[in-house]
């Protein structure tokens, strides 16, 4: 049986990446620091996924195990030494924390003489996630390890899309997911092109697909959350049921469409349909997707290369409209949740410093016109 190592045994790891790996005949070693989840994976060796749609079918994922990377890093290194593929779904901010362990696993493959080509795919909500991870891993590799990695270890970027809401079940491994899923991998950085996963799309140039996903799904989702929170909505579905909010989301997506068409020459009708499907996904009545989940970590989401500021910058360069995105940025700066550290920190920054200084600090912008326009909406 083929073997995989997946970092992140959370809902997305189990409910999306795990499902695809299982369907492709892999044994999956889930790596995490959540001892409850790891114990359950080892005790049961399987878990169930429910598809949130009419009829709500279930999928049983088997041939799984768990490794606590904090307690047993040597087991992770051993698993990496023999594995056929590595994936992650841990969040962009956590990637640097697994880099040293990955590097040790790569060194172990080198010492063992395992020259089977291996690809490491960071399945995260970020542009260039796998290459970012590679830069972190390189910090811990020996000169020999670097040469080995250059020859045998690929870090192809990936774009992933599936809504997996925050949830709590009596069975800690059970997870509910939306029917839609999309996983796209770039081919030009694959070291093992013969290993092709079914239900995964492969593209020579991934950037248009990553930007289509991040600027459409992530920007649209976050827009739903920040405007929804402003109007008191507790779930994304509740936000979309407000015609005023839905209209604003559609206006943001229209601006995103103008950017994607101008930059990547996407077909207008196909993109309109893609955005229509996104709205329908947000309106899925079988999913309870809390505004607090989608809106969390606003400082990260207001970053220079993130889902709002990057498209705004590029729309401005193309002399295209971005006023609805600007309004959403204003709502994001205003978002507060006592359970979200970043939103609280954002409030503290705004209380201590001028709004302009906070905008510069959080967004990384130096375009004075853009900075002033954002300030107007806060």
Swiss-Prot record:
GO terms for biological process: mannitol catabolic process. Its EC number is 1.1.1.17. It catalyses: D-mannitol 1-phosphate + NAD(+) = beta-D-fructose 6-phosphate + NADH + H(+). NAD(+) binds at residues 4-15. It is an enzyme of class 1 (oxidoreductase). GO terms for molecular function: mannitol-1-phosphate 5-dehydrogenase activity. Keywords: NAD, Oxidoreductase. GO terms for cellular component: cytosol. NCBIfam families: PRK02318.1-3 (NF002647), PRK02318.2-5 (NF002652). Belongs to the mannitol dehydrogenase family. This is Mannitol-1-phosphate 5-dehydrogenase. The gene is mtlD.
